[in-house]
């Protein structure tokens, strides 16, 4: 058998090596990639479009990807804190057409001496310490309410104290007025106020200056006041008016959280009249806030009230000369006939229920309250279970001058505000009316 010699093998290998070297000198290296200018520009364009898409709060990625991911990988309270963290540092999306296509021709509403762009507000409880005000306004809210804020810092109830009912788009919370206290929030508000005042400047004309603590045209900042667990049932609120009133467009007296022992007892007529009368007197002593406006006083009440109790609240509000009533807070009821959640241990957690199952209760309470206040100047604010434009319209027709969201916003993400705004405007245009024209129209 023929066996090639070692010399032959070496000769053959050297020839192959020379040919490969020659080929390499004339062929481009295919393993190296140098992007052409077109590819580079296209990449930048894709990144820019993607970034713009994610910055728009109404992008589907927020409702259908990011919010579900947060719910999957965090418990309810951790998810809450994460959301506030992102908003605090400006890492959250915004409603990009809030300035141009704001639907204010249909949705604008005159309230407390201001013209709101739309009747959509944020309820207290989300931003407890006023850390994310700008980002929340940038979502499209015309009214943002921070708090509840107590005089002294307190941790609230032990954890776990916040529970999701995802099948019902609902939550149960028993936070218990966890708050960093008046002075810590005051420091945050002062820093924000001075920063924005310097940025805005003092030389603007009245037409240009918003003259509200929102520092945005057609928007207002509300501050919700609570009492410490073992605090005085009157003086705790008076301190809040005195300390935080200068930075508020609206002051809210919260007597309806179910998670502070004895708090709801303040809704009885004698106690409530005394409390609200004292608070209004303190507001009058305070006079105007730092931007020259006297902040109106509202009281926030529960949905778990009988008709006589609602009537007595209306009487107290009129006698004390407060400016309005927010109805309602969370409910201690568990309407099992409307709940899809079947886990009894979860359903029976102590605390207040909010979200979609609350809507029938809060809407009924609003209609009842309207019955006893329509002969007055009291402004009613609807809150509880609102998650779309049709819900908002129902509350408006029942007597709400504007409405507030919280739980639906947490579930659906920042795009919900723009979605409700556009849905509500569409419903009103179908009827050929504006928001102001339909307020309380159910009782005509």
Curated annotation (Swiss-Prot):
FMN binds at residues 124-128, 148, 224, 254, 300, 328, 355, 385, 406-407. The keyword GTP-binding does not apply. GO terms for biological process: 'de novo' pyrimidine nucleobase biosynthetic process; 'de novo' UMP biosynthetic process; pyrimidine ribonucleotide biosynthetic process. It catalyses: (S)-dihydroorotate + a quinone = orotate + a quinol. The chain crosses the membrane at residues 33-53. Its cofactor is FMN. Optimum pH is 8.0-8.5. Inhibited by the dianisidine derivative redoxal and by brequinar. The active site is at residue 257. Binds 1 FMN per subunit. NCBIfam families: PRK05286.2-5, pyrD_sub2. This is Dihydroorotate dehydrogenase (quinone), mitochondrial. It comes from Candida albicans (strain SC5314 / ATCC MYA-2876) (Yeast). The lineage of its organism: Eukaryota, Fungi, Dikarya, Ascomycota, Saccharomycotina.
């Amino acid at each position: 058998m023929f066996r090639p010699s070692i010399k032959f093998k070496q000769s053959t290998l050297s020839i192959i090596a020379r040919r490969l070297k020659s080929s390499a000198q004339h062929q481009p290296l295919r393993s190296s990639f140098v992007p052409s200018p077109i590819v580079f520009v296209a990449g930048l364009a894709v990144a820019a479009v993607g970034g713009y898409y994610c910055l728009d709060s109404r992008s589907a990625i927020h409702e259908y990807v990011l919010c579900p991911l947060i719910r999957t990988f965090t418990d309810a309270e951790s998810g809450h804190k994460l959301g506030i963290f992102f908003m605090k540092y400006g890492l959250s999306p915004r409603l990009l057409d809030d300035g141009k296509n704001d639907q204010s021709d249909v949705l604008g509403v005159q309230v407390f001496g201001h013209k709101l762009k739309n009747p959509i507000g944020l309820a207290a409880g989300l931003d407890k310490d006023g850390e994310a005000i700008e980002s929340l306004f940038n979502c499209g809210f015309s009214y943002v309410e921070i708090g509840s804020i107590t005089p002294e810092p307190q941790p609230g109830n032990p954890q776990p104290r916040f529970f999701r009912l995802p099948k019902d788009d609902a939550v149960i919370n028993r936070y218990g007025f966890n708050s960093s206290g008046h002075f810590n929030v005051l420091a945050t508000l002062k820093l924000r106020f001075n920063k924005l005042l310097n940025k805005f400047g003092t030389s603007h004309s009245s037409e240009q200056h918003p003259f509200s603590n929102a520092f945005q045209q057609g928007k207002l900042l509300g501050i919700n006041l609570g009492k410490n667990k073992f605090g005085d049932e009157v003086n705790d609120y008076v301190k809040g008016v005195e300390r935080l009133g200068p930075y508020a467009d609206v002051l809210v007296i919260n007597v309806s959280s179910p998670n502070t022992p004895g708090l709801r007892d303040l809704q009885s007529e004698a106690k409530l009249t005394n409390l609200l009368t004292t608070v209004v007197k303190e507001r009058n002593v305070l006079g105007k806030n730092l931007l020259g406006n006297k902040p109106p006083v509202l009281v926030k009440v529960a949905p778990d009230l009988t008709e006589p109790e609602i009537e007595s609240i209306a009487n107290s509000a009129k006698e004390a000369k407060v400016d309005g009533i927010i109805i309602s807070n969370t409910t201690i009821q568990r309407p099992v006939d409307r709940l899809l959640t079947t886990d009894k241990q979860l359903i029976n957690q102590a605390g207040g229920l909010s979200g979609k199952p609350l809507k029938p209760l809060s809407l009924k309470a609003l209609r009842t309250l309207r019955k006893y206040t329509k002969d007055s100047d009291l402004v009613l604010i609807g809150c509880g279970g609102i998650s779309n434009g049709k819900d908002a319209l129902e509350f408006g027709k029942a007597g709400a001058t504007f409405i507030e969201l919280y739980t639906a916003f947490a579930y659906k993400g920042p795009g919900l505000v723009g979605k409700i705004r556009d849905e509500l405007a569409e419903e009103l245009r179908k009827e050929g009316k504006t928001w102001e024209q339909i307020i309380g129209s159910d009782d005509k």
